[in-house]
Amino acid sequence: PFLKFATKLMIANYNVPENLAGIIPGLIPFGTILLTPLFGSLYDRIGKGATLMLIGSAMLAAVHFIFAIHIMPVWWFAVIVMITLGVAFSLVPSAMWPSVAKIIPLKTLGSAYSIIFYIQNIGLSLVPVLIGKVNGFDPSYTTSMSIFCAFGVAAIILSILLIIIDKKKHYGLQEANIKK
């Protein structure tokens, strides 16, 4: 949902010319194409899946907080922040999706992934509506970026809970998938 509004954010808050404003948010998908397989391989080799999710979630919250408070309204800073967001967008799924298979029994894994995608698609359909309405009464993007920051904080809390639960139940979220 963030990418839907990111181009206008670049124009409004970072003084990016309209004809170039789409390039900066476009760094995110390009970066995730390169980084997600790299982080997935890292998780396979060193483990620390819940920690990687925690780091990515913290980066996500920090980036949206920075966007909410409008510090350094220059294009090059927006590029740095957007690249950081791309790293976060790569870290979380590269650790999250393989972790599902460690927690959910194989006989219900398909159902678990179905439910995850169901919930994700609810968010992908409703959050843009919410953000669009919020941007209507607050065109500065402070409120909308604060909402995304709150999602990041929720993800931080869930990541910490995963670390705690993994220590108790020994799912192996922090263990490498490739054993030496």
Label the model's feature ranges.
Residues 10-11, 42-44, 131-139:
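Interfacial helix-cap and linker-helix signal at transmembrane-aqueous boundaries
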Residues 133-152:
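A membrane-interface helix-boundary motif in multi-pass transporters
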Residues 164-180:
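Intrinsic disorder in cytosolic terminal tails and internal cytosolic loops
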Residues 1-33, 93, 97, 127-128:
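Extracytoplasmic gate region of multi-pass secondary transporters
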Residues 35-48:
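Helix-to-loop junctions at the C-terminal end of transmembrane segments
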Residues 103-138:
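A late C-terminal transmembrane helix in Major Facilitator Superfamily
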Residues 49-96:
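C-terminal transmembrane helical hairpin of 12-TM major facilitator-type secondary transporters
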